Amino acid sequence: MKKPAANIKYRILSVLSVISVLFIWELVTDILHLISPMMLPSPAKVLNTFIYKLCGGVNPDGATLLQHIAASMKIALGGYVVGVIIGVPLGIAMAWNRKFEMFAKPLFDIIRPIPALAWIPLMILWLGIGYWSKVGIIFFAAFISATINSYAGIKRTSQVHLWVASTFGATNMQMLFKVAIPTALPMIFTGLRLALG
């Protein structure tokens, strides 16, 4: 019985804290005029502008807020999907095949520490200012995270599981697809989640 009461109290306090912040914000900006509306518009003004832009209000470029959101999602998902499609198989291949790891990992380790934002000048030089340069920057962020976690997940596969599979006559590909990848899925999905950030 104590848990539901505590839960309700927590929800009430959460709502009250948000309402308090909004009230103080409105008080400071619109009622007492302590802060210029140019510096910090009131919550009512922000809400009115949001609704206006959402419902097709006139923007300088003629697009609605939903059109801007759709354009941003197209760029973000484009880079993310390509980064994951290349990064996950690369990480798995590097972790599973020693010869491929010796070839690819040094090259990957060169670009791995470079932050995604550092690629901006190169992307602009290579791809211009437009859709593809933005996708390229997001691609690198997603690619690095997906590759690292896929690699780590396969490397953490229990050797005992691989020995058991080998004892039962599993081929190299069967061990990869039936043992290593299922074991690595939590790490791979963590990489996919981090790649979204």
Predicted region positions:
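Hydrophobic alpha-helical elements at and bordering transmembrane segments
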Residues: 65-69, 73, 103-104, 110, ...
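Generic hydrophobic transmembrane alpha-helix motif, especially the helices
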Residues: 109-145, 152-153
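Transmembrane alpha-helices
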Residues: 136-140, 173-197
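Intracellular coupling helices
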Residues: 155-166, 173-178
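Transmembrane alpha-helical segments of polytopic membrane transport and secretion proteins
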Residues: 1-19
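Hydrophobic alpha-helical transmembrane segments in multi-pass membrane proteins
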Residues: 71, 75-83, 117-121, 182, ...
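Periplasmic/extracellular loop-to-transmembrane helix junction in inner-membrane transport proteins
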Residues: 31-81
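Transmembrane-helix boundary motif in ABC transporter permease subunits
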Residues: 78-108
